[in-house]
Amino acid sequence: MSIAAGKDFNSIMQMSMKDVAAQMKMASPKLAITTCGQRNNALLRVKEALLANKEAIFEANHKDMETAGANNIAPAVMKRLKFDEGKLTDVCNGIDQLISLEDPLGKQSLARQLDDGLTLYRVSCPIGVIGIIFEARPDALVQISSLCIKSGNCAILKGGKETVNTNRVLFECIHKAVVEVGLPEYSLHQATLHNEIDELLACDRHVDLLIPRGSNQFVQYIMNNTKIPVMGHADGVCHIYMDKDADVEKALSIIVDAKTQYTAACNAVETLLVHKDIAESFLPKLAAVLQENKVSYRASKEAAAILGCEVMEEEDFHTEYLDLILSIRLVSGVEEAIDHINYFGSHHTDCILTENADTAKIFMEMVDSAGVYQNCSTRFADGFRYGFGAEVGISTSKLHARGPVGLEGMVTYKYKLYGEGHIVNDYATGKRNFHFKNL
């Protein structure tokens, strides 16, 4: 399928954000009523389009990578920018998994007869129009678009300027595929100009939810400058607590994976807390494997005395490095580890390494994070690895959705009440009575 954009596509791209959002609000009910088969067919066509146009995608990404290199973009960001065969395979696998998942729409979570002939249902439905502002990751554009298609949501997408060429080609492939199978033309829109972010923030009449992905400063800016509900997370200051009852070999493998498997990810570990009773024996082993994997480390005064490294200031434990750097601190036990995590962490994903079930239970119940793990890498905090097909982001909020936000987090619900001429006055005057029977 050619990615050449038609006249309608180009005219949409030239419209104001306010006008686009208004059109998408009108298209939203039409997308919501599509069948799961129609939406799955659209996803299949998206996958086919991406594979058919992969050379154009890679060429565009090469331009973005060259520009980023010339601008001395940080290595952590450069890693996110790259879209190669591996990334293409990953997003296509994610689409396949999404297709295999059941329809998130029309699912009943309540069926109750209020009275004879008066029946209430609570049924899942799309949120409506969602604005997603994401960082310099072209694969995120594919994941987010796919999730919105499957969940029946219209999406306004604004990617980072660092991948403007890659995002343009990817979006043209996706939009053309979606329209060709009969989904509304205004199902998806790509915002390309920086000033369109502020225009989007003002579209509270037409946009139902914003999902920003980026720095803490950026997410706070979004929250402070819009009336639209915002879902998402800012930092990913993830922790691992090394308990005195941990399996050392298992622990070292997990720590290395959590730090180095994909350093630039928000679910990479940034701080390691070590029980003081095992510090003398464990820290030298840790230092050896970190050095072997080119990970530098900073530590609290007590840990630094053993490691012979830089001493950290207390406030530095808030730092999200997104790099091959690890903060290390000694703690007296699980309670102090929990206090540290709940204070310095970002409520993203935190892990305990221990073979003691009682200690693990305390940690799992008391750490106030979206993901709380035992004996596994924090890198598992991901929609694809959870079997969600993909994720629109990771939410550290406690309302609506928490953790990796897949299909379930992309829907809300409505109440459907079916009657036969029932009026409230009959119940207010005692002519009729509710009997509330769950069906």
PLM regions with names:
Residues 2-120, 147:
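N-terminal Rossmann-like NAD(P)+-binding subdomain of aldehyde/semialdehyde dehydrogenases
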Residues 15-16, 135-139, 143-154, 169, ...:
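ALDH superfamily catalytic-core signature
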Residues 27-33, 272-274, 323-332, 347-352:
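Short, well-ordered beta-strand elements within core beta-sheets of diverse protein domains
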Residues 36-40, 105, 181-188, 261-268, ...:
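Flexible, glycine/charged-enriched surface loops at secondary-structure junctions
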Residues 41, 339, 343-439:
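C-terminal core of ALDH-fold dehydrogenases
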Residues 100, 109-249:
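Rossmann-like NAD(P) dinucleotide-binding subdomain of oxidoreductase/dehydrogenase enzymes
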Residues 241-244, 273-276, 331, 353-355, ...:
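Short beta-strand-to-turn element immediately C-terminal to the catalytic PLP-Schiff-base lysine
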